[in-house]
């Protein structure tokens, strides 16, 4: 039996800002169901966690965490949910705030969390054989685990969810936050800054990321965000494991957010669309396909490409709904287009999970023209709700969506290769052509219905990673 301790900055169902929370919430349970492992999870006790959860947490103890020359108190709480044990690290100064990211001292906050992770190993009723850390917020914990060796022969795995977020801090924080010799600086420093993500990459026994294609991409300058050379040097220890989704949660047959549940019947999608349009004020047009974007409105998501071609595509007989928020420039743009095309487009700038699910259940197509996408969640959800993804060939989008071939009848969506607006427009018009041919559309939808990406496959791949990293295969120097 292997004992795995996940350390993460967010985790469903307690706190979520993005896909990291879904991984941290779903993968541990899938790993336990795979067998041969007990997986526990540790995360900060944020003020933002709902009181209905916090009232159930069991206080374990308080302990002292050294942050350079300072000493801070950490409180340890424990909770068991769906057969998984969760630990929460509390500190009023660092975690009693509105939201969980975006503060000037985020680096310090998650150095504290990383120090607390290592210190807490003395107080939890669990001796991990593997410490599995996620993203820059816990990269320092991987470094400290290797330096301090709090548990004999503790193996470390570090997962990169998005390499563009690296948790950098001024070089002076090395002396301010750590009681370490200067010989350890090289493993944390990058470009005259302390780099939390680099710290995890440098010290981990195994490095994973969230899709096979993304693992290849981050070895190149275009995607590597400055760390490609270091990753190239460790490429033998880098593996891409595709994320999954919870197929019980994202199930249109039982989803309580939907006014009309369904398995595969196309007519049920139209019923959902009719009710959705009544709610948001868009006129239903028979035979007109609905395209949706459920996304953050930021450059990474390919919004610049959409800006260049949207008005031309809106000349076609289609409708579009955009759900998401982000950069003001993009928010203003979509609201302006909505104003000028009121019968064809609606923009909803406040993300709402229930509305997102109703969009998936009503739409024909999901558009994801991402500049880069480590794995992607929306395209996997779309497939579950019988909605056809249109994606750029990058990261997990390339690994999960196969371009439809009208000759062979293979494929579960549409793809374009280059980050180019003309290619995007071409594939959008091609998707409309296929939609307008019922025999081809029927073949495509059958393929979509067969596409399943559960956590079961991800758990099996991670179990193999843990198994490979036995005590004889890693260095503890």
Curated annotation (Swiss-Prot):
Recorded superkingdom: Bacteria
Q: Which organism is it from?
A: Oceanobacillus iheyensis (strain DSM 14371 / CIP 107618 / JCM 11309 / KCTC 3954 / HTE831)
Q: What are its GO biological-process terms?
A: glycogen biosynthetic process
Q: Name one GO molecular function term.
A: alpha-1,4-glucan glucosyltransferase (UDP-glucose donor) activity
Catalytic reaction equation(s): [(1->4)-alpha-D-glucosyl](n) + ADP-alpha-D-glucose = [(1->4)-alpha-D-glucosyl](n+1) + ADP + H(+)
Task: Kindly name one Pfam family recorded for this protein.
Answer: Glycos_transf_1
The name this protein goes by in its record: Glycogen synthase
Entry-linked SUPFAM superfamilies? UDP-Glycosyltransferase/glycogen phosphorylase
What InterPro entries does UniProt report for this protein, alphabetically?
A: Glyco_trans_1 (IPR001296), GS/SS (IPR011835), Starch_synth_cat_dom (IPR013534)
> What keywords sit in the KW lines?
Glycogen biosynthesis, Glycosyltransferase, Transferase
Entry EC no(s):
2.4.1.21
| UniProt-listed NCBIfam families | glgA (TIGR02095)
Task: Say which enzyme class the record assigns.
Answer: transferase
The annotated pathway is: Glycan biosynthesis; glycogen biosynthesis
Provide the function of this protein: Synthesizes alpha-1,4-glucan chains using ADP-glucose.
Where, in this chain's numbering, is ADP-alpha-D-glucose bound? 16
**Family of the protein in this entry:** Belongs to the glycosyltransferase 1 family. Bacterial/plant glycogen synthase subfamily.
């Amino acid at each position: 039996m292997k004992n795995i301790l996940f350390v993460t900055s967010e985790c469903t169902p307690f706190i979520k800002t993005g896909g990291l929370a879904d991984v941290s919430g779903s993968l541990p349970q899938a790993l336990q169901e795979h067998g041969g492992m007990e997986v526990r999870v540790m995360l900060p006790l944020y003020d933002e966690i709902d009181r209905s959860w916090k009232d159930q947490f069991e206080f374990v103890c308080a302990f002292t965490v050294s942050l350079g020359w300072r000493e801070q108190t950490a409180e340890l709480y424990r909770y068991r949910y769906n057969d998984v044990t969760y630990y929460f690290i509390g500190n009023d100064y660092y975690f009693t705030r509105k939201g969980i990211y975006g503060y000037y001292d985020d680096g310090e906050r998650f150095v504290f969390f990383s120090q607390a992770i290592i210190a807490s190993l003395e107080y939890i009723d669990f001796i991990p054989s593997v410490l599995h850390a996620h993203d820059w917020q816990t990269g320092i914990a991987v470094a400290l685990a290797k330096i301090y060796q709090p548990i004999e022969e503790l193996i470390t795995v570090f997962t990169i969810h998005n390499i563009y977020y690296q948790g950098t801090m001024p070089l002076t924080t090395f002396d301010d936050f750590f009681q370490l010799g200067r010989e350890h600086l090289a493993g944390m420093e990058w470009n005259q800054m302390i780099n939390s993500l680099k710290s995890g990459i440098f010290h981990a026994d195994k490095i994973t990321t969230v899709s096979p294609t993304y693992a290849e991409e981050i070895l190149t300058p275009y995607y590597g965000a400055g760390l490609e050379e270091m990753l190239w040097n460790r490429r033998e220890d880098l593996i891409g494991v595709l994320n999954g989704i919870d197929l019980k949660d994202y199930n249109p047959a039982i989803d309580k957010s939907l006014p009309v549940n369904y398995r595969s019947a196309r007519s049920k999608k139209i019923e959902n669309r009719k009710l959705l349009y009544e709610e948001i004020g868009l006129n239903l047009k028979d035979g007109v396909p609905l395209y949706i974007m459920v996304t953050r409105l930021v450059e990474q998501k390919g919004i610049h490409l959409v800006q260049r071609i949207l008005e031309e595509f809106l000349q076609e007989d289609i409708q579009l709904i955009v759900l998401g928020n982000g950069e003001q420039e993009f928010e203003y743009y979509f609201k302006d287009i909505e104003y000028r095309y009121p019968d064809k487009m609606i923009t909803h700038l406040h993300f709402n999970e229930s509305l997102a699910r109703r969009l998936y259940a009503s739409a024909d197509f999901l558009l994801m023209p991402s500049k880069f996408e480590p794995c992607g969640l929306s395209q996997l959800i779309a497939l579950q709700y019988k909605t056809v993804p249109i994606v750029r060939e990058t990261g997990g989008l390339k690994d999960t969506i196969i371009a439809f071939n009208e000759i062979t009848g293979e494929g579960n969506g549409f793809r374009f290769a280059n980050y180019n607006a003309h290619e995007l427009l071409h594939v959008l018009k091609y998707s409309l052509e296929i939609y307008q041919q019922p025999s081809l559309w029927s073949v495509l939808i059958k393929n979509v219905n067969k596409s399943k990406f559960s956590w079961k496959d991800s758990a099996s791949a991670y179990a193999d990673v843990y198994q490979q990293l036995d005590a004889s295969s890693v260095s503890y120097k």
